[in-house]
């Protein structure tokens, strides 16, 4: 009984951290990386699809991405999608290749991004704590239904607390990495 609750909590906490990593990958640092454009959607024959489904995205150098659409007709649509995304990038096309230079971040912009990153990390911590609460409530329901003893509940709660602590520690590590990456000049 308690094992399934713990497994569920662990899986959900892991998903929270994975979600945090995905959100942080979208936040632009001064360096170019292909996952930066992952969430950019391009209109392709009437439906919006991720850019990775209509073009190759490569890193040309530390500050430049190259996007090569598979169809020549898609060049302008891909360029427009990158321009209108919330990333603040200004692509330029050269024939069938779109170059996306990464502008250097100002100190002020870096600080703003750090605030955003900290907010995302806090959201992940809150999600993990909510998962802990759900697990503890499930344990209380089992005690109430006389399916487990109070001692078993206490042991399980302690284990869930350890899980919570380790996952929050992981969130802090991810946050520290991203902050360090953002503050690099």
Swiss-Prot record:
GO terms for molecular function: ribosomal large subunit binding. GO terms for cellular component: cytosol. The keyword Nucleus does not apply. InterPro entries: Ribosome_recyc_fac, Ribosome_recyc_fac_dom, RRF_sf. SUPFAM superfamilies: Ribosome recycling factor, RRF. One of its GO terms (biological process) is cytoplasmic translational termination. Its main location: cytoplasm. It is found in: Cytoplasm. It comes from the Bacteria. Keywords: Cytoplasm, Protein biosynthesis. HAMAP family: RRF (MF_00040). Responsible for the release of ribosomes from messenger RNA at the termination of protein biosynthesis. May increase the efficiency of translation by recycling ribosomes from one round of translation to another. Belongs to the RRF family. This is Ribosome-recycling factor. It comes from Thioalkalivibrio sulfidiphilus (strain HL-EbGR7). The gene is frr.
């Amino acid at each position: 009984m308690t094992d399934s609750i713990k497994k569920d909590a662990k899986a959900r906490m892991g998903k929270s951290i994975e979600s945090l990593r995905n959100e942080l990958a979208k936040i632009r640092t001064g360096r170019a990386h292909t996952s930066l454009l992952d969430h950019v959607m391009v209109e392709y024959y009437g439906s919006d699809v991720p850019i990775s489904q209509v073009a190759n995205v490569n890193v040309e150098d530390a500050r430049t991405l190259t996007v090569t659409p598979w169809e020549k007709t898609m060049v302008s649509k891909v360029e427009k999608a990158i321009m209108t995304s919330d990333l603040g990038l200004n692509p330029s096309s050269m024939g069938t290749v779109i170059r996306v230079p990464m502008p250097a971040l100002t100190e002020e912009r870096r600080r703003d991004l750090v605030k955003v990153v900290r907010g995302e990390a806090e959201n992940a911590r809150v999600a993990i704590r909510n998962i802990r609460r759900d697990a503890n409530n499930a344990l209380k329901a089992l005690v109430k239904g006389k399916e487990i003893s109070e001692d078993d509940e206490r042991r399980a709660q302690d284990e869930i607390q350890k899980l919570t602590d380790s996952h929050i520690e992981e969130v802090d590590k991810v946050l520290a990495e991203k902050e360090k990456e953002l503050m690099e000049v």
